[in-house]
């Protein structure tokens, strides 16, 4: 029998991530120190799973704020008002999560919703008419490589294409159907990148399959089947 976990709590035994993030928001530490604390947490969590004998250890399950937001950034789903702030990648991410008021501008955070009737709230990705959904980030591969350098083989975890489309809010005139081909192409490129980096397993989470199907959802699901094939 082989064992796997779908993901690992990211906050830390002593809530290290929470406290470090709050220090960063108060400008008490630099981004480099926050990233170092995050790296230490990932190493600890992978090591715990390895020592417990887990066969399929997860990576890319770490997040500074929310995995849905992580996936949105991975797919270049970043509204213009946040890009126009011209902040660092990390600060743009936090602006989407928390809002931003400073020298670069004043924007509110993206909306939040309950994650499938749980008490967890996710950041709702916002797709504009001119949003180009494409693979635009290396977090998944980078964290796999980080674990590999420690001698730990992992399976990256990522929210799947079908669920991402169902979770997105479309703010323009274009419906979700107009983005099906682009999101499938982005995920195909993600799979190719995984193959190029000798990643044997990838876990695509599709919790939206528990929802009732709408007419548009059947098209999404067929597109998802195309990706899987």
What are these regions (language model features)?
Residues 1-222:
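Domain-level signal for soluble alpha/beta catalytic cores
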């Amino acid at each position: 029998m082989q064992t796997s976990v779908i993901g690992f709590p990211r906050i830390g035994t002593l809530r290290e991530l929470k406290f470090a993030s709050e220090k960063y928001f108060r400008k008490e530490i630099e981004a480099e120190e926050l990233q170092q604390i995050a790296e230490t947490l990932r190493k600890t969590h992978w090591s715990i799973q390895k020592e417990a004998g887990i066969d399929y250890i997860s990576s890319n399950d770490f997040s500074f704020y929310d995995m849905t937001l992580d996936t949105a950034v991975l797919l270049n789903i970043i509204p213009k008002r946040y890009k126009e702030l011209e902040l660092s990648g990390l600060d743009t991410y936090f602006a989407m999560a928390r809002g931003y008021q400073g020298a670069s501008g004043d924007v509110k955070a993206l909306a939040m919703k309950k994650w499938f009737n749980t008490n967890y709230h996710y950041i709702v990705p916002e797709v504009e008419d001119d949003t180009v959904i494409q693979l635009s980030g290396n977090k998944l591969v980078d964290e796999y490589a980080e674990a590999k350098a420690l001698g730990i083989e992992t399976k990256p975890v990522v929210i799947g294409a079908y669920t991402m489309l169902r979770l997105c809010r479309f703010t323009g005139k274009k419906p979700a159907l107009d983005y099906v081909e682009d999101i499938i192409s982005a995920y195909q490129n993600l799979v190719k990148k995984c193959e190029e980096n000798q990643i044997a397993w990838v876990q695509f989470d599709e919790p939206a399959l528990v929802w009732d199907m709408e007419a548009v959802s059947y098209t999404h699901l067929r597109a998802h089947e195309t990706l899987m094939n």
